[in-house]
Every structure is written in C-alpha cells, then in structure tokens.
C-alpha cells in the first residue's frame, strides 16, 4: 500500500469530553477558574485580570503571565481550535500560541474592542520584542446568546509559522499572517491554547477542541 505523504497524523486530539485533560497537555500559568465541561464538550476558562503576553515594543512593558495550555512538539505541525469567547474588557483575547521562550513566540486570537470593531490579530515576538498585526473581526459578533465564535489554525513549517482563521472547522480557511521565529527548527516547541485579560476580569472562554497534527513520516 502506498503511503500518502500529504496526510497528517494526530499528535493530540483533545475534545474535552473526559474528566481530565489529555496527559500530553500541561499548563503554564493556569487561570484561577477553569474546568472541563463534559455537557458541552469544551474547556471553560476565565482569564485572570491583568494577564498578557507582550514584550517591550511601543508600550514599554513586558508581560509573560497569560494562561497557556500546551503540548510539546518537535518539527513541523499544525494546531487547530474552535473558540467561543465572551469578552468583558478591551483586549480580552483567546486563541492559539506557539512558544520557544519568553522572548520567542507567536500568538493569534480575537481581540475585543468594546466600542468596536473588534479584531483578529497575531503577535510575533523575536529577541524579546513583539510585533502586532490585526484585521477587523470578519464574523458576526454577539449573535445567538452573545460572544465571538471563530476557528484558528497555526502551522509550523521549519522556522516559519502561518496563521489562518475560519468561521468553522470545515473552512473556508483564510491566511492572516506569515512570520518567522528566530529559533532552531529542531528545537522543542510548546503549542496550544492561550487566553489573557490585560485589563479586567469577567471574560469567559469556551475552547471546543485542540488538535495538533504532524505530517506522516517516511517509512523506514
């Protein structure tokens, strides 16, 4: 049988339907309030106030206390999630992150603006300096009970990362950012879900799943 080299393989597929998290997952700075809701098969979390990931640029501060639920991977991979975020304060955010260190990482998420329009954004941090890009949130907000619903995909290809967004897991997927992280392509990478509330508390996040995939390896 011929092996399809383009078919991805699951490194992790957490549907948040069990009593505990997949043992491959671990927290960096867990929020005070989080739990698995088996009734809706999602991870619920409420980011603590004054939490963020940012390094120096323009604003002159460093923050590395955001909430990050990750698995460790090596080599090329793709992380995908579906998020429903109920924000309360400006810059409330939830999405995906890939991280090598406090000074080398990428994150992508919704970014709430109470006076609108809200954003989908990406922050790329190299050598301790962050670079922020964003676009207007392209999907309907505050419909059917409120919140912002969206899917995100973060692909690692060597040193390069591609950020994509979609209204649903089936797509269509839209490219939002292509960036390089100054890191060893063989270095262990932490990749997974993150959430922050840089100002006040009250934001609620539902993560429907976290899937991390890698390309099929050549048979030996």
Feature map (PLM): residue ranges:
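Extracellular glycan-recognition regions
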Residues: 2-220
């Amino acid at each position: 049988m011929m092996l399809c080299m383009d078919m991805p393989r699951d490194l992790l597929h957490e549907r948040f339907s069990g009593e505990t998290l997949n043992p491959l997952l671990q927290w960096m700075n867990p929020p005070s309030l989080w739990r698995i809701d088996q009734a809706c098969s999602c991870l619920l979390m409420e980011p603590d106030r004054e939490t963020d990931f940012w390094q120096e640029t323009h604003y002159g501060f460093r923050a590395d206390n955001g909430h990050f639920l990750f698995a460790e991977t090596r080599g090329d991979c793709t992380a995908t999630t579906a998020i429903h975020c109920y924000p309360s304060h400006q810059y409330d955010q939830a999405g995906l992150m890939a991280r090598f260190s406090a000074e080398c990482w990428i994150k992508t998420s919704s970014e709430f603006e109470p006076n609108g329009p809200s954003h989908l954004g990406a922050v790329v941090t190299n050598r301790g300096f962050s670079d922020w890009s964003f676009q207007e949130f392209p999907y309907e907000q505050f419909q059917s009970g409120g919140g912002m619903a969206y899917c995100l995909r973060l692909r690692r290809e060597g040193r390069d990362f591609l950020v994509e967004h979609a209204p649903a897991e089936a797509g269509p997927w839209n490219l939002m950012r292509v960036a390089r992280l100054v890191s060893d392509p063989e270095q262990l990478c932490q990749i997974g879900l993150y959430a922050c509330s840089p100002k006040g508390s009250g934001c609620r996040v539902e993560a429907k799943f976290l899937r991390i995939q890698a390309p099929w390896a050549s048979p030996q």
